[in-house]
UniProtKB/Swiss-Prot annotation:
Gene Ontology BP annotations: protoporphyrinogen IX biosynthetic process from glutamate
Function: Catalyzes the decarboxylation of four acetate groups of uroporphyrinogen-III to yield coproporphyrinogen-III.
Classification via Gene3D superfamilies: 3.20.20.210
Chain residues that bind substrate: R27, Q28, A29, G30, R31, F46, D77, Y154, S209, H327
Protein name in UniProt: Uroporphyrinogen decarboxylase
The keyword Cytoplasm is assigned to this record: yes
Native organism: Nitrosomonas europaea (strain ATCC 19718 / CIP 103999 / KCTC 2705 / NBRC 14298)
Pfam families: URO-D
Length: 355
C-alpha cells in the first residue's frame, strides 16, 4: 500500500473522515499560469506538450508549486484516444482541436479498432510514472479520460460544436453506427484508464463534457450506458490501494440518481445545481465533487471566499465532499484568485468536519 503525505482527497472520495474539505481545480495546469505558457512555448505546440512526458510532468507540477492543492491531475488531453485511433488530431490557431478524418462513412466506422495503450498511448503512461516519481507521494495523482459520447462528438463532428448536427443526425438516423463507435470507444477508455492505474494513477475521472446536450432518454442510452460499461471493467484496486473514480457530466444535474446507480464512487457537479440538494438526492451514497462557477474567480478575494462559503454551507457537516469548480478554470483567471479560493476552502471547511 502507498503511504501518502496528504490523502485527504482519496479519503473524501471514499467518504471517510477528513479534517477539512480537499480542493483541486479542473484544468489547474493551464493557460492562466504564466509558467505554463512559458513551458508551452518551449514545447512548440500543445500536442508536443502532451506527448512529451518531461513537459507533461513539468506542467502537471506547476500548480502544486504555487498552491496547496490536495491532488494533482495528469496533464493530457481527452482526445488522445481518437488520435491513437488514427483520426489525425491537430490544433488550428484560435479554433481548438480538429480531426483530419472525422467519422462519417460506415466503412470507416466499422473499421475502428481499440488502440493498445502500451504502444499507441505509451507517452501518457510514461508521463504518469514520471509524475508519480516527481510527486514522491506528496498528494495523489488523478488520471482521466473523456467519456465515449464526448469523444464520439469530436470524432463525428470533426471539431467542437454548438449544435451537434452531425452526431445527432447519426444518433437518430443511424443509431447502430453510433452504438458501434461508442462500444469501441468504451473498450478503449477502459483499457486506457486501467493502463493509467497500472502506471500509478491513484484516482480516475471520466469527463462527459457533452452528455448534457442529450435528451433524457438519449443520455441513458448513448452516454451513461457506456460509462457504466467502463466502470464494469475498471480496476478498483491496485497494489493494495483503492482507486476511486469520478463521473462528471456537464449539465447532468437532472440525472444524479441514474449516475449514482452506475456504482461510481463520486459524481462531479457543474455549477447549475445546488450541492446541498444533490447531497439530499444521493443520500450520502456517493461522494460529490464541485461546484463553484469558474466565473466567480474573475471577482475579488472577498467575493470568492463568500461564494466558496455558500457551497460549503450548502453541503453541510460531514464527509464525502471534494471542492472543485463546476468546469475548467478559465485562461483569464488571475492566479492570485485561484490562491484565494484554495485558502478560503481550507480555512472555512474545518468547521464542517468537527463533531
Amino acid at each position: 500500500m502507498t503511504k501518502l503525505e496528504n490523502d485527504t482527497f482519496i479519503r473524501a472520495l471514499l467518504r471517510q473522515p477528513v479534517d477539512y474539505t480537499p480542493v483541486w481545480m479542473m484544468r489547474q495546469a493551464g493557460r492562466y499560469l504564466p509558467e505554463y505558457n512559458q513551458t508551452r512555448a518551449r514545447a512548440g505546440s500543445f500536442l508536443s506538450l502532451c506527448k512529451n512526458p518531461d513537459f507533461a510532468t513539468e506542467v502537471t507540477l506547476q500548480p502544486l508549486a504555487r498552491f496547496s492543492l490536495d491532488a494533482a491531475i495528469l496533464f493530457s488531453d481527452i482526445l488522445t484516444i481518437p488520435d491513437a485511433m488514427g483520426l489525425g488530431l491537430y490544433f488550428a490557431d484560435g479554433e481548438g482541436p480538429r480531426f483530419e478524418r472525422p467519422l462519417r462513412e460506415e466503412r470507416e466506422i466499422r473499421s475502428l479498432i481499440v488502440p493498445d495503450p502500451d504502444t499507441h498511448l505509451r507517452y501518457v503512461t510514461d508521463a504518469v510514472r514520471q509524475i508519480r516519481t516527481a510527486l514522491n507521494n506528496r498528494v495523489p495523482l488523478i488520471g482521466f479520460s473523456g467519456s465515449p459520447f464526448t469523444l464520439a462528438c469530436y470524432m463525428v463532428e470533426g471539431a467542437g460544436s454548438s449544435e451537434f448536427r452531425q452526431i445527432k443526425t447519426m444518433l437518430y438516423a443511424r443509431p447502430d453506427l453510433l452504438h458501434h463507435i461508442l462500444g469501441v470507444t468504451a473498450q478503449a477508455v477502459t483499457a486506457y484508464l486501467n493502463a493509467q492505474i497500472e502506471a500509478g494513477a491513484q484516482a480516475v475521472m471520466i469527463f462527459d463534457s457533452w452528455g448534457g446536450a442529450l435528451s433524457h432518454a438519449a443520455y441513458q442510452e448513448f452516454s451513461l450506458r457506456y460509462m457504466n460499461q467502463i466502470l464494469d471493467g475498471l480496476k478498483r484496486e491496485h497494489n493494495g490501494d483503492r482507486i476511486p473514480n469520478i463521473l462528471f457530466t456537464k449539465g447532468g444535474g437532472l440525472w444524479l440518481e441514474s449516475i449514482m446507480a452506475s456504482g461510481c464512487d463520486a459524481i462531479g457537479l457543474d455549477w447549475t445545481i445546488d450541492i446541498g440538494e444533490a447531497r439530499r438526492r444521493t443520500q450520502d451514497k456517493v461522494a460529490l465533487q464541485g461546484n463553484l462557477d469558474p466565473a466567480v474567480l474573475f471577482s475579488s478575494p472577498e467575493v470568492i471566499a463568500a461564494e466558496a462559503g455558500k457551497i460549503l454551507a450548502s453541503y453541510g457537516h460531514g464527509h464525502g465532499h471534494v471542492f472543485n469548480l463546476g468546469h475548467g478554470i478559465s485562461q483569464f483567471t488571475p492566479p492570485e484568485n485561484a490562491l484565494a479560493l484554495i485558502e478560503a476552502v481550507h480555512a472555512q471547511s474545518v468547521r464542517y468536519h468537527t463533531d
